[in-house]
Amino acid sequence: VSCEDCPEHCSTQKAQAKCDNDKCVCEPI
C-alpha cells in the first residue's frame, strides 16, 4: 500500500496511518 492510500487503508483496520520510507505502516490506536 502506498503512502497515498495509507489513511484509507488503515482506517478500515481502526489503525493510524504512518509513512515509513514511502511504505504504509498502520499503527494500532
From Swiss-Prot:
One of its GO terms (cellular component) is extracellular region. Expressed by the venom gland. GO terms for molecular function: ion channel inhibitor activity; potassium channel regulator activity; toxin activity. It comes from the Eukaryota. The keyword Transcription does not apply. InterPro entries: Scorpion_toxin-like_sf, Toxin_alpha-KTx_8/9. Its main location: secreted. It is found in: Secreted. Keywords: Calcium-activated potassium channel impairing toxin, Disulfide bond, Ion channel impairing toxin, Neurotoxin, Potassium channel impairing toxin, Secreted, Toxin. Disulfide bonds join 3-19, 6-24, 10-26. Has the structural arrangement of an alpha-helix connected to a beta-sheet by disulfide bonds (CSalpha/beta). Blocker for the small conductance calcium-activated potassium channels (KCa2). Negative results: does not or very weakly inhibits KCa2.2/KCNN2 (Kd >1 uM) and KCa2.3/KCNN3 (Kd >1 uM). Belongs to the short scorpion toxin superfamily. Potassium channel inhibitor family. Alpha-KTx 08 subfamily. This is Potassium channel toxin alpha-KTx 8.1. It comes from Androctonus mauritanicus mauritanicus (Scorpion).
